[in-house]
Design a protein with these regions (language model features):
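Residue-level recognition of single "structural anchor" positions
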Residues: 1-259
Length: 259
């Protein structure tokens, strides 16, 4: 009875704020679920990325902005809050991605798997400093794993944090680039080539760096599920994530708040 009284006591104050969509990416959306569901189904069926203009046409929407916001909310949902970090041996490097004259440094990590099905992670960086690469690796790779890199000296700090660091080449400073990195780290550079081509096709070279992390999340979701042949499973996974993640207002979608 005490528990029942406590529950009843809070209902009059909170019932107006409680809806089945509260705490999900659908919170405060003016678009009904009967539009969201076909949008998610269409979104997960696109292999080469999705544009707001195409979604607007497919759904018969009157404006571009609602379609644009829907896609970005779905990109937020493509990152599961409790997703597992990479394991085993992991290749790590950096690359500049984005539109012409508006490129951003990005950390890239790919698992080394004999079957070629290693997962990947990407995230924008502010530089090639030890602090930046350390933070990137700690967020995305399990402790104690082997990190395979080129000779960038910034990665030397990883050994102090329980990682086995395996540089594939002699050391060089933060301001330089290893010309043989493509051969030394084939998996990560294959992924970099793929995401560059994908971004060009998705954004037509007009990508605003504020939204780069959001687009990278979409690419990672698709890349890590590239062997899946069941469209329904992708739809189900994204819908699960959409319910599990926090609401995604515009300020969260922009890179001022990392996704």
């Amino acid at each position: 009875m005490e528990n029942q009284a406590r529950v009843v006591g809070v209902l009059p104050m909170s019932i107006s704020a409680v809806t089945p969509l509260a705490g999900t990416i659908f919170q405060d959306s003016r678009i009904p679920l009967r539009i969201w569901f076909p949008a998610i189904w269409w979104f997960t069926s696109q292999k080469n990325g999705a544009s707001a203009q195409t979604l607007q046409r497919v759904l018969g929407m009157s404006g571009h902005e609602p379609a644009w916001l829907m896609l970005h909310k779905l990109r937020v949902a493509m990152v599961r809050p409790s997703r597992n970090r990479l394991a085993g041996q992991v290749e790590v490097d950096e690359a500049y991605l984005g539109g012409e004259g508006n490129k951003q440094l990005v950390g890239v990590a790919v698992e080394i798997k004999d079957n070629g099905r290693g997962r990947m992670r990407m995230q924008t960086l502010t530089g090639r400093t030890s602090a930046e690469v350390k933070n990137f690796v700690q967020q995305h790779v399990e402790p104690g794993r082997t990190i395979v890199t080129d000779g960038l000296t910034s990665y030397g700090c990883l050994a102090d944090d329980g990682y086995a660091h395996k540089p594939m080449r002699k050391s060089y400073g933060e301001g330089n680039h290893d010309p043989d990195a493509d051969n030394l780290l084939p998996r990560v550079h294959r992924a970099i080539a793929l995401v560059k081509r994908w971004l060009l096709g998705t954004s037509q070279g007009r990508l605003d760096h504020k939204y780069l992390d959001a687009y990278l999340n979409e690419f990672i979701f698709r890349f890590n599920r590239r062997t899946s042949r069941a469209r329904g499973l992708l739809f189900h996974r994204l819908l699960e994530n959409a319910i599990a993640v926090d609401p995604a207002p515009l300020q969260k979608i922009q890179r001022t708040h990392k996704i």
